[in-house]
C-alpha cells in the first residue's frame, strides 16, 4: 500500500495512545483564569452523551402532561392547575352544570374536597337561593322562606325571566306554592249478566297539582357553615348576585345572628354584584328582601381570594339543551365577576330511552348550548361528560339500556365537533352492564333505579374525575 497513507495514520494513532497514557497523569487545577479537569479518555469516549438538566426537566414535565386525545382541550386548564400547585395564589374556578346525578353537591362536593386539599381554597362557590334538596346537601346548611318564586330551565317563562349562572332565577313574592300528587284508584269494568259492559273501567293514575298560598312577611335566605369535607366551616368572601332591582331595592344582612345592616342595591338590567365580605370570617349569614320588590336574585358566592372552587349547578330533569335561557350577556357578566377556568356539562340521562336509536336532535340541541357558552365565555375550555351506564329490564333481567352506547357515541361526536373535551363516564365505570355491579356493590354505589348513584358511588366518580382533571389521562 502507498506509504503516503500509512505515515499520517501511524502519527494519528501514536498521538491517541500518548494522550491516553499521559492524560490521567495531569492533575486537576482550578484558577481564576482557567480550570483543568482530570480526564479519563476511555471513560469519556464510552460515556453516553450529556443531556442538559433544564431540557431534561422540561422533557419530564412534557411526559407528565401527556393528555389523552379526547381530553386535549383541557390543556389550558391543566396548565393553570399546575401553576396553582406551584404558587398557591389566585383563583381557579369550575362551573359544573348537571342534572339530578349531582344534586345535593354529590360528586362535586368530593371533587371540591380533593382539589382544595391539593391546591388550596376555602368555600363551596356559588349557591342558589332555594333548593329542593337543601336538606340533603351536606356541604352547607341552607334554609329559606317559602315565598320565593323559582324559575329554571324546567319552568316555562324563562324567556320572560332570564336565568342566572346557577340555571335559576329567584323572585321574592307575597305568596308561595307547593306541589302535591293526586292519585286516582283503579275502577274495574262493570258487566251485566250477559257479559255486556255497563260502565268502562279506569286504570289507576296520578298527577301533580300545584297549590298557591299567601305568605306574610319578607322573603329570606340563610346559609351556615359546616365542618364537612368539601364544605366550609366559615365564610370569608361573600358576594350576592342579582338583577332588575328598583331604585328603592334593598337587602338587609345579618351576620352570625347579629343586628341587620341595610344595603341599597344597584337598579337596572344586567347582572349586579354586592360584596358582603366580613372583616373577619363568619359562620352564618341571613339575607332578607321585601316580598314586593321586583328584584331577581341569582345566588350567593362563598369563596376566598385564592384556591380552587367548584360551583354545583344542578337542575333536576334538565337535558342540557336550551342554554340560551341564560342570556349571553348574563353569562359574560358572571364570567367577569367569577372568572371561570373550566365549564363541565354532565347531561344525557334525561333524554335516554331504551327505544331511541337516533340522537341527532339531541346532538343539535347540545351543540347549540355549547356554542352559546363558547360565545359568552370565549377561551374557557368545556368538558362534556358522557352519560353514565344505566340499566333497563330486558327479558326479565337488568341490562345496559340498548340506547346508551349510541348516546355516548353521539356525545363524543358533538364534543369533537365543538372543540370540547370529552370524558367517557360509561367506559370509566366499566362499560356494558357496569351499573349492575354498582348496584350490587357493598357498600352500594348506585340506587336500585339503576340510574342514580349513592353518596359512595358519587365519591368514586369524583375520584376518577379528579384524576382526569389533574393528569389529563383516562386510565
Walk through the language-model features, giving the residues of each.
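Active-site-proximal beta-strand/loop segments in catalytic clefts of secreted hydrolases
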Residues: 97-100, 312-317, 345-350, 385-389, ...
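Solvent-exposed, polar/charged alpha-helical surfaces in well-ordered, non-transmembrane soluble domains
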Residues: 75, 79, 105, 109, ...
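Membrane/wall-proximal cationic-aromatic binding patches
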Residues: 46-96, 151-157, 163-173, 204, ...
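Alpha-helical scaffolding within the catalytic cores
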Residues: 69-83, 323-335, 364-372, 408, ...
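Conserved, well-ordered alpha-helix/loop/beta-strand core segments that scaffold catalytic motifs
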Residues: 342-348, 367-374, 381-386, 390, ...
